[in-house]
Amino acid sequence: MLDAFAKVVAQADARGEFLSNTQLDALSSMVAEGNKRLDVVNKINSNASAIVTNSARALFAEQPQLIQPGGNAYTSRRMAACLRDMEIVLRYVSYAMIAGDSSVLDDRCLNGLRETYQALGTPGSSVSVAVQKMKEASVALANDLTGTPQGDCSALVAELASYFDRAAVSVV
């Protein structure tokens, strides 16, 4: 896993070059938005349980067959596994957000996840819907500027949404 800073330095080093002005500007921008980034991650972390629970409720309301006998989330053990998996995805999205880079999400969470779900008979499309529901809740929290530094957060919100989109696509 590399954060945005380590990644830029590694790329420049591999080419035997100094950091370009464009790279320095991008890193400078990331530093300037650091408090906003921390606020977004803090909001997600502080509301993680509600994000997961409410997203699962919404998923099961749309797809009640999942919690009926024979469904993939039927029995408390399977339901707990579903909620655990949703929480893990949310946690790794928050790691990617703080790092400003998706590699931790890809390397430690998403790689091989589709194959695992296929082997277990878990419907990837349902997992994808659950991830999208967590995205909606997290983006709403990120867009709530109450108690956060003022300024445009649209780039951070778009970045956050992209990590959820990446996760949703990886399981189908």
From Swiss-Prot:
What modifications does the entry list under PTM / processing? Contains two covalently linked bilin chromophores.
Keyword presence, Thylakoid: yes
Q: What does the sequence similarity comment in the record state about its family?
A: Belongs to the phycobiliprotein family.
Concerning SUPFAM superfamilies, the annotation shows:
Globin-like
GO annotation (BP), single: photosynthesis
The entry's (2R,3E)-phycocyanobilin 1-binding residues are C82
Where can this protein be found?
A: Plastid, Chloroplast thylakoid membrane
Q: What name does this protein carry?
A: C-phycocyanin beta chain
* The keyword Transport is assigned to this record: yes
Q: Which UniProt keywords apply?
A: Antenna complex, Bile pigment, Chloroplast, Chromophore, Electron transport, Membrane, Methylation, Photosynthesis, Phycobilisome, Plastid, Thylakoid, Transport
Q: Which organism is it from?
A: Pyropia haitanensis (Red seaweed)
Q: What's this protein's function?
A: Light-harvesting photosynthetic bile pigment-protein from the phycobiliprotein complex (phycobilisome, PBS). Phycocyanin is the major phycobiliprotein in the PBS rod.
**Residues carrying N4-methylasparagine:** N72
Q: Where does (2R,3E)-phycocyanobilin 2 bind?
A: C153
**Subunit text:** Heterodimer of an alpha and a beta subunit, which further assembles into trimers and the trimers into hexamers. The basic functional unit of phycobiliproteins is a ring-shaped hexamer formed from two back-to-back trimers contacting via the alpha chain subunits. The trimers are composed of alpha/beta subunit heterodimers arranged around a three-fold axis of symmetry. The phycoerythrins also contain a gamma subunit which is located in the center of the hexamer.
